[in-house]
């Protein structure tokens, strides 16, 4: 080994030995525990014990001077602001030197920061320029509590913590020197007079602040039975102080002493928070409000001579005005006395006044009872309208919400139920009234029949009994005077009294029956006549199946309900949504009551009566009265539909989107309109059946058997007019077409006109096939067809004109002389003339109606079927 290498090896061995020796000495000083554990232990021991540990050795002195221990204690006293401390550190970072602390020591701060530079600043060194800007950091002297300066130190000691990590130990020493003597003195005190906290500090504001500081100071003590007993003693003293302040506060409430209330409310607010004095304040105000209001629900209602109950709104208005005055005065009083008046103003309005008025409303509702639903609805909506005055004052909305929140849901359900019940009852009463009228009318006619029958039966029995002896013992003869006298007496009894015949029969008719004055002059005397009279009376009553008065009543009832509901609008979004939902439900119920309940039943009853009408009879006038009545009924239904449109535009348009098909109100309105259209169309279909059947009846009865088969050419004048049957049919249908104008929509009119035209075309086709036509008869038929064509043209239905033009072409088949049979065949096969309405087979069938068909059949068949062809 070279000398240099040997020397380096020796030096390395010496260094290893010295390092080993140094570690052994360090372990001998600190034992086997780490520095972090020692710091944790020092944090948990009391301050006097910490001072004793500091005297053990120099290393313990260094550990006891670590600022992390005192930062922890200041944190327990809630006197250390971590955020502010970090901010101050970064501001003075340029003037600080980084402390050479291990990473384990940085965990003793418990500052929860990832920045090791800030955490390692336990014992920093400041530059001379930085020291000039810092406050005096000398070890403080003991505090003299009898001087003003000493009191000021105590009252500001926790507020004057520098919030710098490097001075945490000095800050804690200041707090200890100021508060520890007072803390021990108060903890071992036997009364509330001798302790320094009450003797040196005389005002309640100073005493409350000192007590708060002492409680915070006690939180920095380590846990243990002895120290916990001292803290409990401090807390007991604080409770006594708080109770004394509450007693003074209560005294101020009783005497309405503003200065006393203002003083102790601020003391209590700073010392223990607002809960204690706010609870006492509200409790006293509850008793005052109960004594202020004297509610008597029985005096609110007034009964008139008709035993109808009304509400005395003056009483409710005075209650609202008194509440506003009380709320305003209380608001001014709390603002003048309390540090945070809103803490009592909201509970006062919501819990005290609100609950008092809520109990008043509940007592009135209980007095009203469940049977007087309308009175309940009127009261709730009316009183809510009066209470809207509360919205103009502070905390008024909360007061209104407390009063009416339990009642609004009940109001919504009851309002809908009330409208549904009353509306359907009106509809049921109307239906019952109609049924009673029909039953009364039927009974009236059958009663007359039964009276005549009973009278005839009685006279027949009287005749048999009285004449029985004569017929047994006397030979009957034409000259028998007794028999003649008896028969004359019976005939005289059967004759009507001329004086009685002069009386007006309408005087003896009940008011609830369908009987016209003309019918009263000829009352039925047989059962068959009575049945006809009952049917006619029902048909006369078709136009009264709907009642505009009933519709107006139900609409007015719905408007009243909507007006009551709208009072609750404008308070809050959820409540507005509930009221809008109620309004839509009311409108839906209105449409159902008028649609399904009234109009549908009326249409069904009218259609039933119309179906029982026999159109195959003659009328005194040229009208089918039931059809006219039904058209009038459609007109009334259209007026009710227009009422609903107007009602929707006025009441529902602000809350409904017109094209929103998912809206229940819009959907129900569409159903209502569809119901009217369907029932009107079905009724018009029945009416068309009646019109066409009567037109068939006119064609049958007004057409003589040989009208079209007469072959006397000389009797035909130069101008051939339409037949009486055609004139009557056109006049009859034209009248009903004109009367429908203005009573139905344009679409319904078009459908009605087309249906009448097509049905008339079918009837005329059957009519032509059922008669035999000569050439002269064909001319008459052509004149009739021209009249029918003009009638259809007046309806402005272009789709019907080809059919009636074809009828004119059909008439040409009859005006060609039989000698020209080949021309007749060619005309029948001309598809351009008949293809719009008839096939060739149908035209061929119509040709059978010619009176000379058998004579021309062979020639016509040759043209139509090609019988003249031959094979060469």
Swiss-Prot record:
Gene3D superfamilies: 1.20.1280.50. Residues 113-122 have a biased composition (Basic and acidic residues). One of its GO terms (molecular function) is ubiquitin-like ligase-substrate adaptor activity. One of its GO terms (cellular component) is ubiquitin ligase complex. Keywords: Cell cycle, Cell division, Cytoplasm, Nucleus. It is found in: Cytoplasm; Nucleus. Residues 30-75 form the F-box domain. GO terms for biological process: endocytic recycling; exocytosis; Golgi to plasma membrane transport; septum digestion after cytokinesis. It holds the Pfam family Sec10_HB. SMART domains: FBOX (SM00256). InterPro entries: F-box-like_dom_sf (IPR036047), F-box_dom (IPR001810), Sec10-like (IPR009976), Sec10_HB (IPR048627). SUPFAM superfamilies: F-box domain. Together with skp1, essential for septum processing and cell separation. Interacts with skp1. Forms a complex with pof6 and skp1. This is F-box protein pof6. The lineage of its organism: Eukaryota, Fungi, Dikarya, Ascomycota, Taphrinomycotina. The gene is pof6.
């Amino acid at each position: 080994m070279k000398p240099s290498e040997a020397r380096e090896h020796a030096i390395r061995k010496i260094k290893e030995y010295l390092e080993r020796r140094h570690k052994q000495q360090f372990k001998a000083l600190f034992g086997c525990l780490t520095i972090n554990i020692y710091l944790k232990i020092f944090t948990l021991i009391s301050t006097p014990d910490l001072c004793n540990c500091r005297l053990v050795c120099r290393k313990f002195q260094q550990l006891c001077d670590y600022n992390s221990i005192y930062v922890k204690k200041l944190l327990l006293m809630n006197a250390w602001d971590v955020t502010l401390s970090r901010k101050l550190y970064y501001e003075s970072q340029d003037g600080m030197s980084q402390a050479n602390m291990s990473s384990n020591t940085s965990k003793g701060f418990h500052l929860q920061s990832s920045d090791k530079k800030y955490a390692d600043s336990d014992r920093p060194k400041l530059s001379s320029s930085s020291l000039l800007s810092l406050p005096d950091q000398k070890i403080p002297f003991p505090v003299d509590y009898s001087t003003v300066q000493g009191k000021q130190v105590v009252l500001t000691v926790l507020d004057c913590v520098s919030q710098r990590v490097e001075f945490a130990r000095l800050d804690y020493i200041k707090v200890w020197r100021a508060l520890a003597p007072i803390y021990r003195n108060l903890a071992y005190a036997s009364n509330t007079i001798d302790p320094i906290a009450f003797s040196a500090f005389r005002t309640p504001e100073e005493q409350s602040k000192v007590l708060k500081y002492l409680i915070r100071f006690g939180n920095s003590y380590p846990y243990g039975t002895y120290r916990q007993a001292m803290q409990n003693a401090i807390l007991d003293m604080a409770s006594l102080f708080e109770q004394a302040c509450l007693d003074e506060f209560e005294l101020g409430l009783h005497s309405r002493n503003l200065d006393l209330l203002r003083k102790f409310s601020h003391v209590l607010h700073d010392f223990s928070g607002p809960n204690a004095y706010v609870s006492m304040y509200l409790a006293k105000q509850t008793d005052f409000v109960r004594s202020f209001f004297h509610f008597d629900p029985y005096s609110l209602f007034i009964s008139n001579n008709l035993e109808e109950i009304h509400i005395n709104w003056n009483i409710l208005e005075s209650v609202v005005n008194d509440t506003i005055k009380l709320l305003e005065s209380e608001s001014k009083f709390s603002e003048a006395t309390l540090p945070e008046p809103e803490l009592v103003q909201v509970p006062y309005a919501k819990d005290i006044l609100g609950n008092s008025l809520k109990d008043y409303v509940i007592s009135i509702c209980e007095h009203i009872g469940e049977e007087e639903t309308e009175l309940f609805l009127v009261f709730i909506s009316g009183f809510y309208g009066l209470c809207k005055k509360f919205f103009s004052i502070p905390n008024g909305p909360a007061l209104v919400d407390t009063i009416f929140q339990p009642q609004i849901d009940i109001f919504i359900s009851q309002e809908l139920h009330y409208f549904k019940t009353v509306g359907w009852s009106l509809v049921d009463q109307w239906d019952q009234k109609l049924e009673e009228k029909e039953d009364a009318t039927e009974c009236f006619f059958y009663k007359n029949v039964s009276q005549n029958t009973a009278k005839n039966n009685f006279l027949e029995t009287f005749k048999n009994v009285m004449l029985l002896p004569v017929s047994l013992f006397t030979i009957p003869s034409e000259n028998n005077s007794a028999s003649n006298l008896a028969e004359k007496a019976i005939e005289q009894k059967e004759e009507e009294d001329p004086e009685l015949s002069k009386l007006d029969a309408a005087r003896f008719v009940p008011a609830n029956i369908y009987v016209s004055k003309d019918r009263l002059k000829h009352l039925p005397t047989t059962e068959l006549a009575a049945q006809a009279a009952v049917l006619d009376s029902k048909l006369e009553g078709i136009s009264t199946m709907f009642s505009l008065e009933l519709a107006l009543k139900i609409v007015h009832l719905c408007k009243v309900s909507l007006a009551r509901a709208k009072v609750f609008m404008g308070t809050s979004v959820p409540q507005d949504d509930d009221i809008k939902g109620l309004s839509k439900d009311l409108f839906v119920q209105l449409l159902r009551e008028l649609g399904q309940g009234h109009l549908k039943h009326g249409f069904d009853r009218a259609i039933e009566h119309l179906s029982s009408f026999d159109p195959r009879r003659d009328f005194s006038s040229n009208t089918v009265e039931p059809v006219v009545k039904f058209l009038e009924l459609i007109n009334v239904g259209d007026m009710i539909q227009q009422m609903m449109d107007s009602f929707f535009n006025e009441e529902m348009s602000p809350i409904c989107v017109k094209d929103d098909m998912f809206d229940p109100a819009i959907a129900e309105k569409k159903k209502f309109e569809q119901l009217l259209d369907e029932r009107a169309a079905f009724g018009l279909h029945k009416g068309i059946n009646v019109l066409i059947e009567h037109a068939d009846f006119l064609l049958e009865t007004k057409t003589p058997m040989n009208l079209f088969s007469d072959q006397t050419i000389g009797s035909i004048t130069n101008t051939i007019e339409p037949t009486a049957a055609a004139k009557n049919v056109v006049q009859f249908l034209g009248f009903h077409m004109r009367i429908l104008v203005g009573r139905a929509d344009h679409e319904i009119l078009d459908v009605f006109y087309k249906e009448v035209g097509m049905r008339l075309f079918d009837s005329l086709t059957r009519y032509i096939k059922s008669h035999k036509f000569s050439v002269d008869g064909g001319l008459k038929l052509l004149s009739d067809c021209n009249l029918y064509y003009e009638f259809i043209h007046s309806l402005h239905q272009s789709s019907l004109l080809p059919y009636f033009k074809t009828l004119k072409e059909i008439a040409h088949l009859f005006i060609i002389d039989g000698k020209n049979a080949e021309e007749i065949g060619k005309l029948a096969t001309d598809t351009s003339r008949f293809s719009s309405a008839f096939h060739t087979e149908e035209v061929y069938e119509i040709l059978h109606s010619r009176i000379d068909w058998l004579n021309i059949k062979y020639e016509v068949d040759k043209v139509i079927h090609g019988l003249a062809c031959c094979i060469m």
